[in-house]
């Protein structure tokens, strides 16, 4: 498989991402079920098929510089 970066074409108002230029995608899905007003709240359920080809190694030590303001 050729390692090309994924090109995100747009993000619509309901947070649907249109992905173009990807050879194969193995997504992570999220779902939340709520019944009534706070009753039977099961929280967020994560599902993953563990076949993702994404490289999760990050060689950065900090993502954002922290500055103190007075």
Swiss-Prot record:
Protein name: Spore germination protein-like protein YpzD
Biological classification of the source: Bacteria, Bacillati, Bacillota, Bacilli, Bacillales
Segment forming the signal sequence: none
InterPro entries (UniProt xref): Spore_germination_GerPA
Similarity section: Belongs to the GerPA/GerPF family.
Species assigned in the record: Bacillus subtilis (strain 168)
Domain of life: Bacteria
One Pfam family recorded for the sequence: gerPA
């Amino acid at each position: 498989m050729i390692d090309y970066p994924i090109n995100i074409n747009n993000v619509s108002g309901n947070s649907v991402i249109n992905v173009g230029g990807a050879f194969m995608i193995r997504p992570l899905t999220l779902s939340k079920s709520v019944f009534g007003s706070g009753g039977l709240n099961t929280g967020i359920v994560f599902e993953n098929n563990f076949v993702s080809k994404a490289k999760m190694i990050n060689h950065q030590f900090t993502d954002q510089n922290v500055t103190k303001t007075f």
